[in-house]
């Protein structure tokens, strides 16, 4: 904080130099106005940085939470985490609630009913315990996902959300959502969405495809055991 105080102090001394010079007072006044505006924004910048730091801390907390589970693989953001362990036939989903407590959901493979991927709330692929398969993501990969966007999305060439929805046999918590794109609270969030060919979208689709594939395999395994 000390270096900022010195920087602003030097800036206003610089402005004072112009104020004391004939013919340059207008410039000095303009520079002071700009400096005051920047100074007024400083608390908001500090608050935003604290929020970013907190989200990063939350992401790290979720990443290392329940380390004893030793999953085969996991994915986490600052508010959710999904993991699975084939030898235990378990999926675990963790969610950070508003009170910053981590809620843990343990889901046996046999309890996974359905998995679907949606781009901008439009379902592009779905697998179900009933055997229903929709969309072409698993068959055609990321290219199929992009091709499955609506005409309006194609015209806009922007995607705002890539979401995995998992339905399970649990009346207390039957539906879980995993978001693969940055949300509004995250640094770098773009309110307009992200271009379809951007690295952000490609990575989000790769992650979504993988976890959707994991759910597909889990559902098939459970169906074989039930037969």
Swiss-Prot record:
Disulfide bonds: none annotated. It is found in: Cell membrane. It comes from the Bacteria. One of its GO terms (cellular component) is plasma membrane. The chain crosses the membrane at residues 16-36, 131-151. It is a multi-pass membrane protein. Keywords: Cell membrane, Membrane, Transmembrane, Transmembrane helix. This is SPbeta prophage-derived uncharacterized membrane protein YomJ. The gene is yomJ.
